[in-house]
């Protein structure tokens, strides 16, 4: 087997109703945004639970009744400053770009969106195909608190899609469901006039409690769309014909501003050459072959056996969730690492332990490297023995049959999503 790697300047982060757009768009960029500090904050085990629920992966019994632990900042990281003004949405610059930062600890990368002239901060999710927003029609008053709420009665362009409903379920715990409206949706100055938008009448508590985000913009394929009886296209699919190229790119960087860009591939955002990988789109995901791995260095590439040989690129998941064989092989090389079934229901280790990098197949001919610096998710402070405990950004898929390349993966690589094929392309961040 021949597996190529690509060396770059910083040594390897890649080695081996008909919607009508307003006008010809060409290309546009959306810089990531953040909300101000809120009382709600995620933690590693909670994010792992959400990933399991989203893809229907069975949880371990230790996760039942789990409550978030105290969260500390990552060792050596300064705490992000709180947003100011209206929930951290800053004014546009001379190019019409909205500029701000990701949320605390890179936990969630968010973007400004306007629906019917009303502003929101939303999560771009390549792992789903529904766009939905918190709204005034929700029946739970508690769920409305600390969110921007879309009010269709205040939009001159809103119309209800008669008899259309959506019901997106993330496993059996997290969900959003309700009627569907059509309205003008604007992202970064690019507009779709009749975008289908779900208005949940109820949402799962875990979604309502996430005060950083007002909803989701689904960017997977239409096949995953849950609107019935007629599936609706995503914002990207509606806009694709009016773009210079039917692509969007994700530049999600650790501790820095990033962006999504539609219609063009900015060569200044990455090093070296892009590696193109065909997408397995039969299930509606941005899914690629991913069955090879190596820990520390490329001297011994191993293959997943009796597991899942593909992985889904999902900007809506924070962690890197891989086959249990990979996870065990990785943490076997981290001194003091252990699976903690009681306090964390996941892999933890002393924060001062040296960490190896992880090589992971992207397609059948190339390996990507996830640097060790990106594989610590967060610190929980000193334990009973006085040793600071860290939660890993790499966690097991619990033999769930699905591997998820979440934001830990994206922080290592610049990624192009291309409708042609479809395909994805990857290179190290510039």
From Swiss-Prot:
Q: Which residues form the propeptide?
A: 18-87
Listed as disulfide-bonded, the cysteine pairs are none
| InterPro entries linked | Aspartic_peptidase_A1 (IPR001461), Aspartic_peptidase_AS (IPR001969), Aspergillopepsin-like_cat_dom (IPR034163), PEPTIDASE_A1 (IPR033121), Peptidase_aspartic_dom_sf (IPR021109)
Read off the Gene3D superfamilies from this record. Acid Proteases
Q: What is its main location?
A: secreted
Keywords linked to the UniProt accession: Aspartyl protease, Glycoprotein, Hydrolase, Protease, Secreted, Signal, Virulence, Zymogen
Task: Give the sugar-modified residues.
Answer: 306
Q: Which Pfam families match?
A: Asp (PF00026)
Q: Can you quote a single GO CC term?
A: extracellular region
The biological process GO terms on file are: proteolysis
Basic and acidic residues bias: where?
A: 87-97
Catalytic positions are 125, 314
Q: Where in the cell is it found?
A: Secreted
Entry similarity comment: Belongs to the peptidase A1 family.
Summarize the protein's role. Probable secreted aspartic-type endopeptidase which contributes to virulence.
**In its UniProt entry, what is this protein called?**
Probable aspartic-type endopeptidase ARB_07403
């Amino acid at each position: 087997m021949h597996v190529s790697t690509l060396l770059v300047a910083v040594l390897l982060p890649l080695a081996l109703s008909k919607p009508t757009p307003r006008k010809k768009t060409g290309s546009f960029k959306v810089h990531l945004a953040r909300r101000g500090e809120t009382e709600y904050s995620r933690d590693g085990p909670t994010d792992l639970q959400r990933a399991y629920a989203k893809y229907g992966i069975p949880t371990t019994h230790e996760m039942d009744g789990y409550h978030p632990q105290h969260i500390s900042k990552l060792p050596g990281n300064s705490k992000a400053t709180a947003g100011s003004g209206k929930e951290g949405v800053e004014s546009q610059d001379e190019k019409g770009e909205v500029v701000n930062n990701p949320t605390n600890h890179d936990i969630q990368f968010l973007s400004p969106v306007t629906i019917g002239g009303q502003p929101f901060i939303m999560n771009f999710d390549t792992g789903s195909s529904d766009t939905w927003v918190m709204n005034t029609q929700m029946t739970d008053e508690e769920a409305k608190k600390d969110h921007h709420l879309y009010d269709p009665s205040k939009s001159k362009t809103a119309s209800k899609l008669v008899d259309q409903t959506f019901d997106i379920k993330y496993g059996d715990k997290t969900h959003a469901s309700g009627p569907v409206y059509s309205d003008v949706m604007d992202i970064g100055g690019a507009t779709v006039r009749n975008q289908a938008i779900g208005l949940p009448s109820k949402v799962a508590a875990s979604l309502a409690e996430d005060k950083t985000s007002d909803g989701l913009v689904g960017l997977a394929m239409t096949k995953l769309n849950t609107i019935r009886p007629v599936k609706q296209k995503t914002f990207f699919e509606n806009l694709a014909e009016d773009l210079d190229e039917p692509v969007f790119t994700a530049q999600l960087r650790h501790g820095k501003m990033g962006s999504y860009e539609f219609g063009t591939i900015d060569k200044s955002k990455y090093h070296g050459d892009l590696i193109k990988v065909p997408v397995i789109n039969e299930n509606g995901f941005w899914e690629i072959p991913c069955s090879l791995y190596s820990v520390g260095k490329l001297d011994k590439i191993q293959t997943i056996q009796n597991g899942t040989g593909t992985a889904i690129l999902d900007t809506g998941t924070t962690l890197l969730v891989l086959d249990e064989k990979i996870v065990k092989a990785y943490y076997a090389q981290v001194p003091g690492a252990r699976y903690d079934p009681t306090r964390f229901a996941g892999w933890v280790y002393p924060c001062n332990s040296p960490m190896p990098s992880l090589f992971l197949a992207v397609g059948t001919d190339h390996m990507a490297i996830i640097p060790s610096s990106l594989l610590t998710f967060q610190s929980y402070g000193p334990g009973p023995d006085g040793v600071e405990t860290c939660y890993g950004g790499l966690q097991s898929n619990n033999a769930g049959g699905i591997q998820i390349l979440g934001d830990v993966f994206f922080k290592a690589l610049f990624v192009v999503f291309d409708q042609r094929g479809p395909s994805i392309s990857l290179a190290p961040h510039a």
